[in-house]
Amino acid sequence: MNYSEKLTGAPPMTEVPLELLEEMLWFFRVEDATPWNCSMFVLAALVAIISFILLGRNIQANRNQKKLPPEKQTPEVLYLAEGGNKDDKNLTSLTETLLSEKPTLAQGEMEAKCSDVPRVHLPDPQEPES
């Protein structure tokens, strides 16, 4: 007679069916957890090894990428880059030209022309007053 037979042998006074007792015995079984613990340890070790391998490959790939010379640009990319530089040069020269020119009308004169008020000639701010 083994351990499970001792536990499933229901006394005559209990009304719990034998099948329910066997199911409860299986559900609440107490066994040695060594196989489960060993399998979890092996799986954890396997995950750690794979992680270190992937980490090492990633580090090596980054090092190799830094060692490679920069990629040669295609003529189309060079043409676009030159075109952008030309546009920037034209834009900067245009802004320099516009900023260096003296504005023809002062703000006050501009407002006076727009309104119906008689013109008032404002003195040029750069002329010295005497």
Curated annotation (Swiss-Prot):
UniProt-annotated location(s): Cell membrane
UniProt feature, compositional bias: Basic and acidic residues: 110-124
Segments on the Cytoplasmic face: 57-130
Sample GO molecular function, one term: bile acid transmembrane transporter activity
Reaction(s) the record says it catalyses: taurocholate(out) = taurocholate(in); estrone 3-sulfate(out) = estrone 3-sulfate(in); dehydroepiandrosterone 3-sulfate(out) = dehydroepiandrosterone 3-sulfate(in); tauroursodeoxycholate(out) = tauroursodeoxycholate(in)
CC per GO annotation: basolateral plasma membrane; membrane; plasma membrane; protein-containing complex
GO biological process: bile acid and bile salt transport; bile acid secretion; positive regulation of protein exit from endoplasmic reticulum; positive regulation of protein glycosylation; positive regulation of protein targeting to membrane; regulation of protein stability
InterPro entries: OST-beta_subunit, OSTbeta
Keywords, in A-Z order: Cell membrane, Lipid transport, Membrane, Transmembrane, Transmembrane helix, Transport
Keyword Ribonucleoprotein among UniProt keywords: no
Pfam families on file: OSTbeta (PF15048)
Membrane topology of the entry: Single-pass type I membrane protein
Transmembrane region(s): 36-56
Annotated segments matching region Disordered: 99-130
Extracellular-side positions: 1-35
Family per record: Belongs to the OST-beta family.
Subunit organization: Interacts with SLC51A. The Ost-alpha/Ost-beta complex is a heterodimer composed of alpha (SLC51A) and beta (SLC51B) subunit; induces the transport of SLC51A from the endoplasmic reticulum to the plasma membrane.
Cited PANTHER family: ORGANIC SOLUTE TRANSPORTER SUBUNIT BETA (PTHR36129:SF1), ORGANIC SOLUTE TRANSPORTER SUBUNIT BETA-RELATED (PTHR36129)
Reported function: Essential component of the Ost-alpha/Ost-beta complex, a heterodimer that acts as the intestinal basolateral transporter responsible for bile acid export from enterocytes into portal blood. The Ost-alpha/Ost-beta complex efficiently transports the major species of bile acids (taurocholate). Taurine conjugates are transported more efficiently across the basolateral membrane than glycine-conjugated bile acids. Can also transport steroids such as estrone 3-sulfate and dehydroepiandrosterone 3-sulfate, therefore playing a role in the enterohepatic circulation of sterols.
Domain remarks in the Swiss-Prot or TrEMBL record: The transmembrane domain (TM) is the major site of interaction with SLC51A. The extracellular-membrane interface is absolutely required for transport activity. The intracellular-membrane interface is necessary for establishing the correct membrane orientation that is essential for the heterodimer Ost-alpha/Ost-beta complex formation and transport activity at the cell membrane surface.
UniProt protein name: Organic solute transporter subunit beta
Organism (species): Bos taurus (Bovine)
